[in-house]
């Protein structure tokens, strides 16, 4: 038996026993081909299978399937004899809810949004002309080469580029990305780009890691998230300070080309000239108005008016000073009279004597023979005995 004979027998066997069946699972990869045919992988917790839905059948589907969609397909299993590869040929398709990846993504997105990690108030502004730029990505990736090539094409030589190598796919990618982010955030960069080229939903899922999202939120450096293609959204896009649809778009957003800078300088020069001309016109108008004023108001007359104003001010000041002096004199007289009254009372009270018996002030009628008393004046005191 030849490979062709075996494949043909297997094809007949599969198409006989697996005809008109229902298949449910989550899309993990998909290609919407230019021919109109759809090619995708459907997976469950442990396995995946290649699927195809040809143009004649998918025209009846009312939506465009995407990675993460959980689908219910009707169709049959077939085998391609030339390669021996078997696949599921779908004749109908409908959504059956969300797949595991999509459900995890939406749940985390909702929770972080409630915590405020996506709040625009916390977004940091991107620098106008960055001088120190960090890029976190795989150092062997095509995305990095595209970004560096675009920077060179723009002839933007103001910035120094720092590359931080990190995994951008797989279970270990979140930890690798976090370590690179911490290192970059300590280097006082002007801005930081987290980048990865396109891939399946599973390939990009490391950028939906909660710990990575929290590190991005805590970072003091402004961060651009540039993951996948324009249709791809990950958690890092929402928590970063700016989302670029692609890595190349991040460069376009951040860097001006030499031509852009020249045009910007020309525009600034034009605005400065307009402002300068406006100022000159204002000063010319002011001089014209002043010349008209002095023409109708001679200088001696203006000086006389100013002298009269100064005389009036002098009179007002003299009047205020005189009133203040009279007020101070009256206040001084009152204080002097009060002092004299207190002084007279003090002199008279020197002759007064206070009698105390048993520590209390006593009247003469309260005293008896042999009582011991204390006689006190302002200057001395004596003990005495009543006869």
From Swiss-Prot:
Transmembrane segments: none
Compartmental location: Cytoplasm
Keyword Nuclease found: yes
GO CC entries: cytoplasm; exodeoxyribonuclease VII complex
GO biological process: DNA catabolic process
Keyword match Phosphoprotein: no
Catalytic activity, EC: 3.1.11.6
Catalytic activity: Exonucleolytic cleavage in either 5'- to 3'- or 3'- to 5'-direction to yield nucleoside 5'-phosphates
Predominant cellular place of this UniProt entry's protein: cytoplasm
Keywords: Cytoplasm, Exonuclease, Hydrolase, Nuclease
Pfam families from the UniProt entry: Exonuc_VII_L, tRNA_anti_2
Gene Ontology molecular function terms on file: exodeoxyribonuclease VII activity; nucleic acid binding
Functional summary from the UniProt entry: Bidirectionally degrades single-stranded DNA into large acid-insoluble oligonucleotides, which are then degraded further into small acid-soluble oligonucleotides.
Assembly and interaction partners: Heterooligomer composed of large and small subunits.
Alphabetized NCBIfam families for the sequence: xseA (TIGR00237)
Family to which this protein belongs: Belongs to the XseA family.
Name of the protein in question: Exodeoxyribonuclease 7 large subunit
Organism: Campylobacter jejuni subsp. jejuni serotype O:23/36 (strain 81-176)
Organism lineage string: Bacteria, Pseudomonadati, Campylobacterota, Epsilonproteobacteria, Campylobacterales
């Amino acid at each position: 038996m030849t490979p062709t004979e075996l494949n043909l027998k297997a094809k007949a066997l599969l198409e006989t026993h697996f005809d008109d069946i229902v298949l449910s699972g989550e899309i993990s990869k998909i290609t919407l081909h230019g021919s109109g045919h759809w090619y995708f992988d459907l997976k469950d917790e442990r396995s995946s299978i290649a699927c195809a839905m040809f143009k004649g059948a998918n025209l009846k589907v009312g939506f465009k399937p995407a990675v993460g969609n959980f689908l219910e397909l009707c169709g049959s299993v077939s085998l391609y004899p030339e390669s021996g590869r078997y696949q599921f040929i779908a004749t109908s398709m409908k959504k059956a809810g969300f797949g595991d990846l999509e459900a995890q993504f939406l749940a985390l997105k909702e929770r972080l949004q409630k915590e405020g990690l996506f709040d625009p108030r916390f977004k940091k502004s991107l620098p106008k002309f960055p001088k120190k730029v960090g890029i976190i990505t795989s150092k062997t990736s095509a995305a990095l080469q595209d970004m560096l090539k675009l920077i060179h094409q723009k002839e933007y030589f103001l910035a120094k580029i720092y590359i931080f190598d990190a995994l951008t796919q797989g279970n270990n990618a979140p930890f690798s990305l976090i370590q690179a982010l911490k290192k970059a955030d300590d280097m006082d960069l002007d801005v930081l780009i987290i980048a990865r080229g396109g891939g399946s939903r599973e390939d990009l899922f490391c950028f939906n890691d909660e710990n990575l999202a929290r590190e991005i939120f805590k970072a003091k450096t402004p961060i651009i998230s540039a993951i996948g293609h324009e249709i791809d959204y990950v958690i890092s896009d929402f928590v970063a300070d700016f989302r670029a649809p692609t890595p190349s778009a991040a460069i376009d957003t951040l860097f001006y080309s030499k031509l852009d800078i020249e045009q910007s300088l020309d525009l600034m020069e034009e605005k400065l000239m307009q402002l300068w001309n406006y100022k000159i016109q204002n000063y010319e108008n002011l001089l014209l108005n002043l010349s008209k004023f002095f023409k109708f108001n001679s200088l001696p007359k203006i000086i006389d008016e100013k002298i009269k104003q100064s005389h009036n001010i002098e009179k007002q000041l003299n009047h205020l000073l005189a009133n203040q002096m009279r007020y101070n004199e009256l206040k001084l007289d009152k204080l002097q009279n009060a002092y004299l009254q207190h002084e007279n009372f003090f002199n008279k009270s020197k002759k007064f004597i206070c009698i105390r018996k048993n520590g209390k002030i006593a009247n003469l009628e309260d005293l008896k023979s042999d009582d011991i008393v204390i006689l006190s004046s302002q200057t001395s005191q004596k003990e005495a005995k009543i006869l």
